[in-house]
Amino acid sequence: FTVSTAGNTDMLIIGGGGAGGVGSGSGGGAGAFLEISQGYLSSGTNAVVVGDGGTGQAVPSSSGSSAGNNGKASSVGSYFAPGGGGGVGGLLTTASNLYTTINGLNGGSGSGGAGGTVASGSSGGLGVSGLGNNGGLVAVGILRAGGGGGGAGAVGLSPAINDAGANGGAGKSSSITGSAVVLAGGGGSGAGTNGGTGGSGGGGNGSNLKTGVAGTVNTGSGGGGANQTTVNAIGGSGGSGIVIIRYAV
């Protein structure tokens, strides 16, 4: 982005969303939501990067789980918005063929904690203060359901009962284009009976089957988690981020 005369401008910078996990998989976290009023840009070329959403990772064998990748950061010059945390899946224990819970991953907004068939509980990943929110935790005693990914406007939710997915955290509104639009929702989690709903602003829905729903492109939203641990089961990819620069002409 080339600036002829140094000065201040309004910017919205959102990182790419994290992908959902597989195996009572948690929802991916939204990318960081950085809105700047009258931020300074120097004259000359200011590098602009729009972060990709994290990709879902397919289960490589006949039984197992997988974690989604974190989203990539977006930036304008020195202004930086990290990507969202990738969702996680319950860890297969070879001795008993049970799935233990795993804590969510940190990011712009954190992913939810994974569920499992061992009721040990898990924590959601941490979001960046002021730019995102934490993912939803899974309480001790809850089985086969992950936590929702954090959204820019709210924390990811936690599953209330066995086998019922948790919703992703709500996105956040911006009026930088002149009209209010909600972006950067968290992904819903996978679960045994029904997946959680993605957060407003483009979060992907979770699934009780083998494929989570992707976050919406150019919203920085998290992807939905998947439940089944069969070969090629995959979490939904995170939505790519977005950069908007508003300046006088």
Language-model-detected regions and their locations in the chain:
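Short amphipathic alpha-helices and their capping/turn segments at secondary-structure boundaries
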Residues: 1-6
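Low-complexity, glycine/proline-biased repetitive segments and flexible coils/loops
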Residues: 8-249
